[in-house]
Design a protein with these regions (language model features):
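N-terminal first-folded block
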Residues: 2-40, 45, 82
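Short, charge-patterned binding micro-sites
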Residues: 47-67
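A structural signal for short, well-ordered beta-strand segments
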Residues: 12-16, 60-62, 93-97
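Short, charged/polar surface micro-motifs in flexible loops or helix N-caps
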Residues: 19-21, 67-70
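A short linear hydrophobic-aromatic micro-motif
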Residues: 43-49, 93
Length: 105
């Protein structure tokens, strides 16, 4: 029998507004930069999950996993700070942290 392991997941739902985007192409360029930085610098898995056809809005789902709730909370805080610094007035973030046991029932 395998030993029990601590496993946690952080899920962030990120709502962004791009007031200066004049086209889908402009929004997608900005969004690609944000997604690349989150993934490359912070190891976050990111997907666009809403408002793909709107010029000035986007909703992203971001996730991270870890073996320590404290470490995962710190990583989530860093992601939020990065986004709020980049989009101080046009970003809203919802965060959920849970253990694997909570998710799997």
């Amino acid at each position: 029998m395998a030993a029990e392991a601590d496993a946690y997941v952080a899920l962030l739902l990120i709502h962004l507004h791009f007031p200066d985007a004049g086209s889908l192409k402009a929004k997608r360029k900005d969004l690609a930069s944000v997604k690349a930085q989150l993934h490359g610098r912070m190891g976050v898995s990111v997907a666009e999950v809403g408002h793909q056809d709107l010029w000035q809005r986007a909703t992203l789902a971001a996730s991270m996993t870890g073996g320590s709730l404290r470490v995962l909370e710190g990583a989530s805080d860093r992601v939020e700070r990065f986004l709020l610094e980049r989009f101080p007035e046009s970003c809203r973030i919802e965060r959920t942290l849970a253990s694997f046991d909570e998710i799997s029932g």
